[in-house]
């Protein structure tokens, strides 16, 4: 165990185009092999598509999509006397954001559209309307936590 304590949180750089740290985080999640300009082109293309399709600020639509994806509960494995229990725990806000972005990008990559920009755009639109694979993942996570509620007293 390290004795220095937790590593300090680094500030998220605010995105120059939309002025939102959420957009920066999304770009960082889309980023592959250090190709930041490609990731920015994908995200900015999806944001412009959101502006065209919804007719309002894409950052608002992104926030609404993330609110629909963010989990409030998850399960963690806890070993007690030879048995492993899935213990439901509440998700901290920072982790909820990270999970939402991770699921959004992961399920965008798994979609069938031709370009990543289209995939991300359509997953964002679906999520903002309460549909899509990322929202289903959240529902499944909540369902797992609900079905394992009996083990909540093993929380640490």
Swiss-Prot record:
Q: Which Pfam families match?
A: Ribosomal_S7
What keywords were assigned to this record? Answer: Ribonucleoprotein, Ribosomal protein, RNA-binding, rRNA-binding, tRNA-binding
Q: Which Gene3D superfamilies match?
A: Ribosomal protein S7 domain (1.10.455.10)
InterPro entries xref list: Ribosomal_uS7 (IPR000235), Ribosomal_uS7_bac/org-type (IPR005717), Ribosomal_uS7_CS (IPR020606), Ribosomal_uS7_dom (IPR023798), Ribosomal_uS7_dom_sf (IPR036823)
Which GO cellular component terms are attached?
A: cytosolic small ribosomal subunit; ribosome
Q: Which CDD domains match?
A: uS7_Bacteria
Which NCBIfam families did the record assign?
rpsG_bact
Q: Which family does it belong to?
A: Belongs to the universal ribosomal protein uS7 family.
User: How is the quaternary structure described?
Assistant: Part of the 30S ribosomal subunit. Contacts proteins S9 and S11.
Descriptive protein name: Small ribosomal subunit protein uS7
Origin organism is Streptomyces coelicolor (strain ATCC BAA-471 / A3(2) / M145)
